[in-house]
Amino acid sequence: MGSILATKGKNVSKQQTQKLIPRWRYFLVMSGLFALPILLITHIAQLQIMPDEEFGVDFLQTQGDARSIRSEIIPAYRGLITDRNGEPLAVSTPVTSLIANPKHLQKLASKKDLKDLSNALGISFTQLSARLTRYRNKSFMYLARQLPVNEAQKVLDLGIVGISGRQEFKRFYPAGEVTAQLVGFTDIDDNGQEGMELAYNEGLTGQAGSKKVIKDLTGRIIKDISLIKPAHAGRDLRLSIDLRVQYAAYRALKSAVQKHNAKSGSVVVLDVETGEVLAMANQPSFNPNDRSKLRPDSVRNRAMTDMMEPGSTVKPFAILAALE
């Protein structure tokens, strides 16, 4: 009898224990469910309301700005080169360079996006893929330099993640080959390389400015915030050249070189009263607006660099000396 009661007592104790354990777990879970929202709300309030320097509003604002606010360069307009009458010999025209972030393109752009991009750029899909692979660890690369604004906008309108545009200036020479050696040309970064463009590069070059902008994840400018430093255009350069005389001298020289089957030729026209140079032309010449087929021997300004025999031009001086 005693053993039976003892067994029953043990059974009751086990049942009570089994009831207590689920209840303990229940209270633990419920306490966690109530405590977690309270902790989250408290933390959110701290981040959004309390101006704590380390983890509050200022911290979030700083972190957000660091990821979206950027300093953008404002390109400076290069000074004009004109003849004595103000006719343009070298001008700067606005263009757009296309920039890509290979990391974003590799991760976020679809195969269709890349095919559309290659078609818009006029290159094969294989070529584009090879370039992106080569720069896959970089966050910056040029897709195309100095495109006409409308052509670049067509690419930007595709809305492909990781592609943005940068405003630049490209030099244009209205007189073309007629003033090629005299005026010279600039490189793709707008630095003078030959002729007057090189000789007066410092004065012609402007000072770039900068501004604060907001950019999205793709690198596109969403909004201008403030101007940091304004851009200053370069100084204009007026030459003593008369473009009308320059055209006439160039045509006469080109005709004479062709007529006599000469390898080269130069002509200089001076104002006899002031000594100013009214025209200076050379053959062979080149088109400074398209230097894809440029030959080194056509770049040289022969009228300035080559040694030439004076020939009969000194005879008047000899006769004058004899008369005296």
PLM region spans:
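Active/ligand-binding-proximal structured segments within catalytic/core domains
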Residues: 93, 311-320
